[in-house]
Amino acid sequence: MSSLRLRLCLLLLLPITISCVTVTLTDLPAFREAPAFRNGRECSKTTWIPSDHEHNPSIIHIAMTLDAIYLRGSVAGVFSVLQHASCPENIVFHFIATHRRSADLRRIISSTFPYLTYHIYHFDPNLVRSKISSSIRRALDQPLNYARIYLADLLPIAVRRVIYFDSDLVVVDDVAKLWRIDLRRHVVGAPEYCHANFTNYFTSRFWSSQGYKSALKDRKPCYFNTGVMVIDLGKWRERRVTVKLETWMRIQKRHRIYELGSLPPFLLVFAGDVEPVEHRWNQHGLGGDNLEGLCRNLHPGPVSLLHWSGKGKPWLRLDSRRPCPLDSLWAPYDLFRYSPLISDS
């Protein structure tokens, strides 16, 4: 539901007076203003200009999507990044949103993070709507879930490297550590989980086709979660990765070769060809599975990023007063104030 502006007038007697006020009906939540985060002494203060074609390695670029349903998670994610960053003023956020809500979302981001350097890019849902087939969970079928495929087209050429974050995670370490990883010859860096059973990701039709399954021949069976990726956008553009991903999406639309939304095309293009990142940078699956969203425990080892991938989202479970134990780790980053039906304008 879009915001709706109404003019309400009240008739007051003795003497007769008509008093009017403009209100806005909205389905977007309100948030507390985040504190200003400043650079440490070791940081060189820089300003990023989108029209500048020179690459500045001291600026960290982070891309996320923005929409009404996951807005609370996105705000918490941004807050967590800034709170733990050594050079927060050198971080530029690139938000991807559909045109329908971009003005409202811009207002919320600006009021919640007055000191944030950010840009909002319009994503046309029609770009992927005809290429999406239904999956095991409705949230995985939303067009904005596929926006990560088009980052190289949406972001300026000057952005040669970007970190992509999902909207259901919080960072509990300095994001500069993730930014500095050496991608070497690879397009994408992400925590990898090898010895995966790929039969679980693709249908029998895929495995019965010599042409389809040959795409994975001689490839290491390595799974990676696409909610946390470091991407070399220059190499992505050179190797026409978007076209390759779209090709698999079109095949899926005709022959249904997988069930899991936007992940399988990434596996078909990148499996076994990803720069491994420490597992601490994506403690994923905290939202449980895609069907029930049951509580999960942390994986063994150190943690730099907590990711509530899966059906269960921490803000929904906290609001329902049925949180999982690990949801308490997300709560300190929640800037949610209230969800008004009517707000003054």
UniProtKB/Swiss-Prot annotation:
Superkingdom assignment: Eukaryota
Annotated GO biological process: cell wall organization; pectin biosynthetic process
Family annotation (InterPro entries): Glyco_trans_8, Glycosyltrans_8_dom-fam, Nucleotide-diphossugar_trans
Stretches in topological domain Lumenal: 29-345
GO molecular function, one term: polygalacturonate 4-alpha-galacturonosyltransferase activity
Enzyme Commission identifier(s): 2.4.1.-
Cellular compartments annotated: Golgi apparatus membrane
Pathway in which this enzyme or protein is active: Glycan metabolism; pectin biosynthesis
Protein name: Probable galacturonosyltransferase-like 3
